[in-house]
Amino acid sequence: MSRTLRTRSEKAESRWTLSPLGAAAPGHGKRLRLWVAAALAVAGGGSDALAFPGLGWWPLIFVGTPLILLSLVGRRLWESLAVGVLGGLAFWGTHILWITVYLGPVPWLALAGLESIFFALGCALIALAWRFSDRAFPGIWGRLCLTPIVIAGLWTLREYVTSNWPYGGFSWGRLAFSQSESPFGALVAWVGISGLSFLLAWVSALIVQVAREPIARQRVIQAMAPVGLIALMLSIPAFPVVTSGTIRVAAVQGNADAGLFAAYTPGQILQDHVAATEPLYGTSVDVVVWPENASDLDPLKNDQSAGILNRVSQQMNAPIVVGTITTDADSTFNSLLLWKDGDGPVDQYDKLHPVPFAEYLPDRGFWSPLAPDLFSLIPRDFTIGTRDNLFDINGVIAGLAICFDIVDDDLVRQMIAGGADIILAPTNNADFGHTDQSVQQLAIARMRAIEAGRSVVNTSTVGTSAIIAPDGSTIDRLQTFQPGVMVQQVPLSQTVTLAMVAGRPIELTVSGLGLIGLVLAALLARRRHQG
C-alpha cells in the first residue's frame, strides 16, 4: 500500500474511532473560519445583552450563548482569546452602557474592557474543552452528555470568579439574571443563581452539539436532548414557600435629584422624601422604608435631620428605615438607620459591599496616578461595614441590602441564616437617568426574592421601586422619576429554600465539573493521541 493511501486510510479510521461511550461522528471537529467565528461571537454577545432588561427578550439567551460557544469550536488559544474579547465587548458594551450617562465613556470602556478580558479567558478554557472533549469523548454519549456539562461548568466557573474577584467582583451580567420574567426563573429557589446559569449554559452547549452533527437525520433525533432538558427544567415545580403572616410596609420614592453631580442644597433630598411621605400621615403601617441616601444630612450628627425623622416617625406611628452617610472617626459609611420617634437610631447597618471605583477607590496610591482627573470624582472612600445586615422591626427580622449589596450571593445567604423574614433593598439610582440600570437591578432583586423565598421591598430615590413577592410576582410598582408611595401588606416567610441550604457548594460543584472535566478530557485526549 502506498504511503498516500495508508495516510488516507488512517485519517478515515481516526474519524470513526470507537469509544466506550459510542461511535464517533465523522467530521465532528470541523471549525469555522476565524472571521465567521468572530461575527458569531459579536452576534452572540449582542443577543445575550438583549435578553436582559430593559428589552428583556429572555429567550435570546438560547440564541446568543450557543452562538458564542459555537464560535469557539476548534479555535487555537490566541484565536479563542480574540474571539472572546469581541464577544465580551459586544455583550458588556451593550449591557452596562448606562455607566456613560453621568460618568462618560472612560469608566464604561474600562469596566467593559476588564470584563471582556475575563470573558475571553473563560472562552479560552471553553475552546480547550471543545478541542480535548472532541478527542476524549467522541461517542454520542460523550458528545451529548459529558462535553456539554464540561462546557457549562466552565462558563459558570468564569461567572463565579468574576462575581468574587477582584475587589469583591462584579456580579452583573450572569446568565441567570436574564430570566427574571421567564418560567426558568423559578429554578433559582432550587439551584441558586449559579445553578441556573449552569443549566442555561448546558442547554446552550447541547444546542451547539446538535448543530454540529454532520447528518441531518441525526440532528433531528438528537435535538430531543436539549428539548428534553428544557422540558425537564420546566417540569420542576416552584419551591413550596410557606408564608407566615404579613407586615404592612410604606415604601417611599421621593424623586430626589440625588445623583453624584446633582446641584442640590443641603437637606433638599431629605425634604423631598418628607414631602412624598406626608400624604400618608395617619395611615396605619408597621414600617416606613426610605431609599439609600434619602437623608443627605446625617441625623447622627445633625439635629435638624434628627428632628425631622422624629416628626415623620411620630406622624406615621412607625419606625423609619432611612439611608444616609455616616462617619465614625476617619471612616465614612453608606448606612441604613432604623429610626424611632423618642428613641432615635435603634439600629444601624453599614454597607458591606460598597462599589469599587465608585464608592471607594481600592489601592488608591496605585490607581489614582493612572487617571487623576477620573479618580478625583471619588473624593472619599466608603469603608466596608462590619455590622450584621439585619434589623429587628418590632419582632420582624428584615434582611438589608443597600443597592449593589443585592448582587452579592453571600450577603443574601447571611440574611437568611440570620433569620430574615423579608428583605429591604433601599437604593439610589439617580446617577443612571432613564437607562436600563434600574430595571436590571430590579430583575436581580426579583431573582433574589425567588432564590431566598422572601419578599423584597426595592425602594429607590427615583425608581424603579417595586415590592416583589417570594414567588417573584409584583405586588406593587411605581413610575420612575415621579414621587410616590407603595403601601402594602407584604408576606413574610421563614421557609429556607434548597438554594439557601446548599449555598456556595452549588456553584463550587458546577464550576468544579467544568474544571475537572477539562483536565480529564485533556488527559484522555493525550492518551488517545499517544496510543
Regions inferred by a protein language model and the residue ranges of each:
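Soluble catalytic regions of membrane-associated enzymes that act on cell-envelope
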Residues: 236-357, 361, 390-394, 400, ...
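Conserved beta-strand and immediately adjacent loop positions that scaffold enzyme active sites
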Residues: 248, 335, 387, 455, ...
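Membrane-embedded alpha-helical bundles of multi-pass enzymes
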Residues: 3-8, 13-237, 433-434, 445-448, ...
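General beta-strand structural signal in soluble alpha/beta enzymes
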Residues: 162, 167, 322, 348-349, ...
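Short, conserved active-site loops that position catalytic residues or coordinate cofactors/metal ions
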Residues: 52-67, 91, 253-254, 284-297, ...
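Flexible, glycine- and charge-enriched loops at secondary-structure boundaries
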Residues: 115, 263-270, 435-438
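CN hydrolase (nitrilase-like) catalytic-core segments centered on the catalytic cysteine
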Residues: 102, 106, 119, 137-139, ...
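Active-site catalytic loop in hydrolytic enzyme cores
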Residues: 99-106, 133, 162-191, 311-314, ...
